[in-house]
A protein has these predicted regions:
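Cytosolic/nucleoplasmic/matrix-facing N-terminal domains/tails
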Residues: 1-168
C-alpha cells in the first residue's frame, strides 16, 4: 500500500479514548467495521503508521492520491459532496451504536465518534474515492480548518423567480 501523506507529531496531538491513542487502534477499528458490514465507511479511513515522530498515511488504491486543493473547483465540489455522504453514513452508524442497549455497541459508538471529531482530519482523493486522516488534533486548534464546509448548489427549482409560479389570468 503506497504512503501518500505524512504529518509531524510536533504539530499534532493524538486523540485518545479510554487512555488509548486511536491511531494505534486501526486494526481493531477495521475488524469492528468489517464485522458490522461497514466496508464503505472503512475504505474512507486512511491507514496510519507511526515512524520517526511522524504519522504516515496510506490507502488501498492503485491511483495517485492528492489533497483536495490540488483538484479543480468542480472536482473539489464533487469530492466534498462524497465527503458529506460519508459523514451522513458515518454519523447514522455512530448514532445507532450510541443509542443501542448493548454497552459494547455504545462504547464503539463513542470511540468512533471521537475518531474524526478532531481538527486534523484532512481530505484526499484518488479521483474516484475519498480518504481522510483521523485520530489527531492540531496543537493550535484555532489555526485552520482543514476540510472546508461544502455548500451544495441550489436546486434548479430554487433558481427560478417566484413570479413564474403565479397563474396567468
Amino acid at each position: 500500500m503506497p504512503r501518500f501523506y505524512s504529518i509531524s507529531t510536533t504539530d499534532f496531538r493524538p486523540i485518545s479514548f479510554e487512555n488509548v491513542y486511536l491511531y494505534g487502534e486501526y486494526k481493531k477499528i477495521k475488524n469492528f467495521l468489517v464485522s458490522n458490514n461497514q466496508q464503505e465507511l472503512l475504505k474512507v479511513l486512511s491507514i496510519p503508521s507511526y515512524k520517526n515522530n511522524n504519522i504516515e498515511w496510506s490507502a488501498s488504491t492503485n491511483n495517485e492520491i492528492k489533497k483536495l486543493d490540488e483538484y479543480s473547483q468542480t472536482q473539489q465540489d464533487k469530492i466534498l459532496s462524497q465527503y458529506n455522504e460519508f459523514l451522513n453514513s458515518y454519523n447514522s452508524f455512530i448514532n445507532a451504536l450510541r443509542s443501542s442497549k448493548n454497552q459494547d455497541n455504545k462504547n464503539w459508538g463513542e470511540l468512533l465518534f471521537s475518531l474524526i471529531e478532531g481538527t486534523a482530519n484532512e481530505l484526499f482523493s484518488d479521483g474516484e474515492n475519498i480518504f481522510i486522516t483521523w485520530g489527531w488534533r492540531l496543537l493550535d486548534e484555532n489555526s485552520k480548518k482543514l476540510i472546508p464546509v461544502y455548500n451544495p448548489p441550489p436546486s434548479i427549482a430554487e433558481d427560478y423567480p417566484k413570479e413564474i409560479d403565479k397563474e396567468i389570468d
